[in-house]
Amino acid sequence: MTDTTIQSFAAEMKMSVDQLIQWFSYIGILKTEIGIVTQREKEILFKYMNDNKSDISKKLILQRKTRSILSVSSVGGKNKKVQIEIRKKLTYVQSTLQETEFIDVKNKMVLDANREASSLIVRNNRLVNKKISNTLGPSSLTKISKKNHRYSELIEHKEKVIGKISRKFEDKSLQDSDETQLLKKKTKNCWDIELNNTNAISSNLGDSSSNSKLYCMPELLEKNNNQKLENERRNRSRVRTRYRNGGKLTKQHKRGNHHRLYEATSDEFGMEEELYIPNRVNKSKRKQSALVQVFNKPVQTITRDIIIGQTISVAELANKMSIKSSRVIKTMMQLGIIATINQIIDQDTAQLVAEEMGHNVILRRENELEELIMNDRDIDITSSDTTLANRAPIVTIMGHVDHGKTSLLDRIRSTKIASSEVGGITQSIGAYHVSTDNGMITFLDTPGHAAFTAMRARGVQITDIVVLVVAADDGVMPQTIEAIEHIKAANVPVVVAINKIDKSEANPERIKNDLNNHGLIPEEWGGDTQFIHVSATSGNGIDNLLDAILLQSDMLELKVVHHGMARAIVIESFLDKGRGPVVAVLVREGTLKCGDIILCGTEYGRVRAMRNEFGHEITSAGPSIPVELLGLSGSPASGESVIVVRNEKKAREVALYRQGKSREIKLARQKEPNIENIFSSIKNTSVVSELNLIVKSDTKGSSEAIRESLENLSTGGDVTIKILSSSIGGITETDVALAAASNAVIVGFNVRADPTARRIIEADQLDVRYYSVIYDLIDEVKQAVHGMLAPRYKHEIIGLAKVRNVFRSPKYGNVAGCMVVEGMIKRYKKIRVIRDNIVVHEGELESLRRFKDDVNEVRSGIECGIGIKNYKNIHSGDMIEVFDMVKISHV
């Protein structure tokens, strides 16, 4: 045989590698799983295994597994089932020659002890009887014989103890041959102790001839007392085990050795014994649960620190104070506040309740993180070290639609934006900056259409100077007046540009008079408003307008910080399919750079790229510079503030907090049910005409303007316009699915449907409308609303006749002889019978005759006979009113 690895040798020996390594460790050879086994090591292992083969064959091992399910009671009252597996392993070893000899010696010693004890008893009885017969009477002999009988029982008990000790060590001697000698010593020591006790008793009995009283040995009393204490300890352990096992005693405890012990006592006649039985557990008692909760009443009032935010519910407040909600409600009722368990209460009320119940209140500002991140900036205007520099003025161009605002801006920028706009009108805010000889100016072009009121209001809020454009041939119009109101509300200086001055019908003086009525007084009239005559077509007066703007900005002394973390404002935002959310912002202070972490309303992100108004890539932008940036998580609302922060993680937390607050505000705006709302809902249930719309637009501002305009088209209950969704971006599959489920019309403003959505639209034949001009969108929706309205009719009175007499006709029944007093009576028209100015019948005119001839109409001042269909209760003096149903158009 050659050297082999430990794995191959284990496979050859048909045992595991671990077992083989264990065998090698028995013979003092250490091996590992990757070791090599030599031929010499194999021979040593085989020899060792052959020597121990006889020992192995003398052992018999029995293994038994018992599986059961234990049901354990839980706190909630339900029982939990636990699977239990009990494994038993019994080993039987054949006795050796030495163990057999030990057993024989032990049996011989027991027999010798029994003979010696018997001889001691016989000898003691003889001596006692002889002594007593000489000194005592018959009654005393009887007592002594009883005591001797008790001593004999005690000796028998000691023999039983010796037998049990022997049996115990016999069982132990069968375990292993190596422990045989140790067991012999233990058995011999125990035997010596018991034998000494027996000899002491016998010697005491032998000395009884000199003493008439017998006393118990101290060792026996001490042993009995120890045994008594041991039994009490076992009883306590058994009780604890019962509770721990769910009220069930194990077999080991049930089969425990409950010995009957004799309690030795001493009296005046000698030693007496009483039978002592250990206390047992009362099995009739009800089994207690293994899991028992015990609540101890606090000895003193517990005061906690309660952290309260801006709002908190009653249940949450009770949870923070670790009390029941009913106690909180009771305390609130005592304070005069009625609330339910789920009602939201404000911070002041919660503080009052918590302090009333003895707790310390810590008020927490929910926007603390928001304030922290806003203040953690490197720009501090109040600091003396901050350097302020002039910035370009932000000028907003406002005015009525088609008054030439964008054309004027094109003339200033030398571009042609107006010609490229759809419909020739501006439908979003555009920001541009222009460099002049005297400095730079940033212009904001706002829409003039009535639907873009919110856009114009935002433009005024972020501007420094407003240029109000008024057409010289058109005059002051509604949007012009609205712009003046926005200017007054924002308290912004204004420069009036009277455009189209080169037209023949231009009348600047009339415009000055009209604006004077609205509070804009020209400088030549003693006011402070500059009026500049310009022409966007020819360019006349453009330089004068720029000089007026720069003069006004110099008077304002516009200064900001040019370096540091930037702050900007959102002008417009839209969703680009390739680039994601695109946000047009206007920098107000600092320098905005690529890579900055920004927070904008409920959105956050990192600036990935920036472009100017010409579409060129830039890396930074200073104050008063409009840019388009990429990198936000979503499209923010127009007018939101953009702030550069240091930590992106904190920016995300603030954005999520703002989203939650926005959701709470939307829920709070829902009106609580009252009588008026209930009647309004009952009224609306009868309305069957409802127009569901899904609005998709290119920019956020356009979406808001369209939504507001469409909601204003509702006709007061006859037709309800319900906007199910309003968002930016193209028409997607989700929008089409929503339209199909809700039977809605999809309105797309400067957007188109993607291929997947287009296929679904064609398959389901959904109604999708595309628009590029907001005029067309509003007009078509208005026509659709009017088409859904139920037709309206009004009663037009065409004639009035007075009944003078009533005749009986076999064909028509009662016929009224009438005189037409007003208008004309026509056949087959609707009529009303009026008696004492009260309508008693409304029906149809069935017969109209002039003398005996049927006629179609009878004019005023002519007598006629009128027959009314299905009505005979007509009296003389009644008035018959003839009317026609005329359809009226909706306004």
UniProtKB/Swiss-Prot annotation:
One Gene Ontology MF term: GTPase activity
Top-level taxon of the source organism: Bacteria
Annotated ranges, domain tr-type G: 390-559
InterPro entries linked: DNA-bd_dom_put_sf, EF-G-like_DII, IF2_assoc_dom_bac, IF2_II, IF2_N, P-loop_NTPase, Small_GTP-bd, T_Tr_GTP-bd_dom
Region (G4): 499-502
This protein's UniProt keywords: Cytoplasm, GTP-binding, Initiation factor, Nucleotide-binding, Protein biosynthesis
Record flagged with keyword Methyltransferase: no
Location of the protein in the cell: Cytoplasm
Pfam family, one: EF-G_D2
A single Gene Ontology CC term: cytosol
Region of interest called G1, as start-end residue ranges on this chain: 399-406
PROSITE patterns: G_TR_2, IF2
Residues annotated to bind GTP: 399-406, 445-449, 499-502
Similarity comment: Belongs to the TRAFAC class translation factor GTPase superfamily. Classic translation factor GTPase family. IF-2 subfamily.
Protein name, per record: Translation initiation factor IF-2
Biological classification of the source: Bacteria, Pseudomonadati, Pseudomonadota, Gammaproteobacteria, Enterobacterales
